[in-house]
């Protein structure tokens, strides 16, 4: 039987281009450009530049450089979530922190590349290592998340 992830691009539960309810270009309620509650530039509670407790650059317990339990190079106890392209190619991995509001993103070589902060509306905002907002992650209907850039383009999914 073929790998179901290989068919993600053709699966309306995952692909937002096939499902308007999970497509931020069609559904303004899930698009941070139109919904100020999930936009970190308009809601400082979900902006790690203002809410230091959500910032792994400033909070040692969330920083994989300072907390080896969060670094997949140093521990085997990580969540095991994978970041994939829309074509189901491996982009990297996701580590859940003890603080459920923060996820850490790593590339295929297990280098820390970004972090994501819970937007309190079943999604996360993605920030690069410098703390700049680069995109967002929204729940899909297959039990995972879809990743988008700031323009709302689908860049991948997490399972």
Predicted features and spans:
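Repetitive, compositionally biased segments used for assembly/scaffolding
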Residues: 2-159
